[in-house]
């Protein structure tokens, strides 16, 4: 489905979003101690956030701005987890004033800042410690977050001393452990490795007589960018069953998940129009009116998105040609796909760039003084 609106624009399938949310609920329905938080950073469109909050998910926020957006969209403050390696004092204060559920703390220095802010406001701060589990993940280097060389989290050997240090912080309450090893993960072995590492750390806590009420395993579940119509809903069954089978929770513990891409990616399509088909000596270029200012993932990560010529499909064109699909931005990296096989493409054709619901609209920019893309719902 497309709309008679100026391009480029994002088109969101709210029906698919609801089916995705229903699939998540189906997997955790028998586990009252399982809690899913939606990662606001994946897509902060207000209409999407309102639908997700109405479905009962919590929110995973990484900035004060995201906390504000989450609250305005109906997420209960108590269901908000505030992560991020660099929290400013004003963000910490706003989170405390809002009464969020927990901070996911990434360093002893941050812990001290939270205690100072909470003490000055005479408000309690519930904190989980983000531990770097040194677990590699099968994903792009830019979105792997759980290795020893990454900037995120507290080293494993520092876990117990940092927890003990909280005893001297009157405004801080230790509420659990937080982990996140990466994004766009499709190999369940990655999550199993995380479970085994958490089990090891829990045994260490047991020996020290420390109980972590909450275990937050982050997110990271990937989606099928190649054939979105074949797998419109991610493999939540395998994802959740990995934790059910491999993670050894203690009695009374709650398990938290932070899902973003897997919730919203497939519901979004970037619709663009062909400005020109440029025929060079070695290449044919399809030049769109959308660029990396509208969808930066291909330029930033080398990410793949399925691309379809909607007009050619409607007109039932049969000839297939090879094109480089590019944007109008004055940068050589403004490429959506090289050597794309498309039905014969002409000036004015509508092009769909699929699986663009996550890290698409939310990462758009006004570089080259270009307007931000519009968004519509179907």
How does the language model describe each region?
Residues 1-125, 168-173, 203, 207-210, ...:
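A charged N-terminal "starter" segment
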Residues 13-16, 20, 24, 44, ...:
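General structural feature for long, well-ordered alpha-helical segments within catalytic domains
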Residues 2, 242, 253-378:
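Charged (often Lys/Glu-rich) extended helix/loop segments that serve as interaction or gating elements
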Residues 17, 41, 63, 95, ...:
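Conserved, mostly hydrophobic/aromatic
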Residues 40-44, 65-66, 86, 107-109, ...:
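Active-site-proximal loop/turn and secondary-structure-junction residues that shape catalytic pockets
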Residues 30-32, 119-122, 168, 208, ...:
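Short, glycine- and charge-enriched coil/turn segments that flank and shape catalytic ligand pockets
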Residues 134-276, 342, 368:
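Active-site loop/helix belt of alpha/beta enzymes
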Residues 59-60, 80, 103, 177, ...:
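Hydrophobic residues within beta-strands of alpha/beta enzymes
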